């Protein structure tokens, strides 16, 4: 009788002792078969550091009853220069997850796209999607693979937002997972998180406004307002640009799946926030002049 050992790597029967390729992992398969096709940060080549590369920030994530919303600003910087004003930093990666990645812009984009392919590749081969815990582990492995490049300046840190379809309570099925540069991860229990150069200002804003969150729309408003506050204090974070018509991007994820928020809705919320802040500043200035 042959016993199975689930914790042991599968072996090639033709060559005992030689591990087979983990074909359910697209990144692992590509690394073994065609490493030159991988992004530089994941082992596809050598890099000389990230001093002259553009950086993207800031990402915010909030849970609401029945789901989660993730949003990001659009600015990328190169040193003290603005490198781009319409960079996309939030991506839907499968039916129930989305990622927002801050750091080196090129690495962040490749991370998000490769992660989406990784999840799709697994589902096609295995016939079932990964559990949420499995999705977290796959992204953690990718982040850990980038550690050497991160130490050379090519750092990109993701935030994973998702809806756990296996959660016992659908109202609390929204999930937020943060990662460190070594691939360590943490499920956020506070209900919100932020990453990027403006994260400290965004989190401070969310902390004061989070009690207003009751549904997806109110969570979206708080997320946009947090990015507005971050842009007010952090030069690397871009706020809503009414002149150019450039606004943050956002994704909501609930029981019905992940969906991008329309630009028109974000623009409407941005105008409301700016108008309310303008009235507050105007009233404050008049009040301060009285004696």
Curated annotation (Swiss-Prot):
Superkingdom to which the source organism belongs: Bacteria
Gene source species: Mycobacterium leprae (strain TN)
Assembly notes: The 20S proteasome core is composed of 14 alpha and 14 beta subunits that assemble into four stacked heptameric rings, resulting in a barrel-shaped structure. The two inner rings, each composed of seven catalytic beta subunits, are sandwiched by two outer rings, each composed of seven alpha subunits. The catalytic chamber with the active sites is on the inside of the barrel. Has a gated structure, the ends of the cylinder being occluded by the N-termini of the alpha-subunits. Is capped by the proteasome-associated ATPase, ARC.
Lineage: Bacteria, Bacillati, Actinomycetota, Actinomycetes, Mycobacteriales
Catalytic reactions of this protein: Cleavage of peptide bonds with very broad specificity
Pfam families associated with the record: Proteasome (PF00227)
GO molecular function annotations of the record: threonine-type endopeptidase activity
Protein name: Proteasome subunit beta
Location within or outside the cell: Cytoplasm
EC class of the enzyme, as a word: hydrolase
Residues cleaved off as propeptide: 1-56
Biological or metabolic pathway of the protein: Protein degradation; proteasomal Pup-dependent pathway
NCBIfam families in the cross-refs: 20S_bact_beta (TIGR03690)
Keywords: Autocatalytic cleavage, Cytoplasm, Hydrolase, Protease, Proteasome, Threonine protease, Zymogen
Catalytic residue positions: 57 (nucleophile)
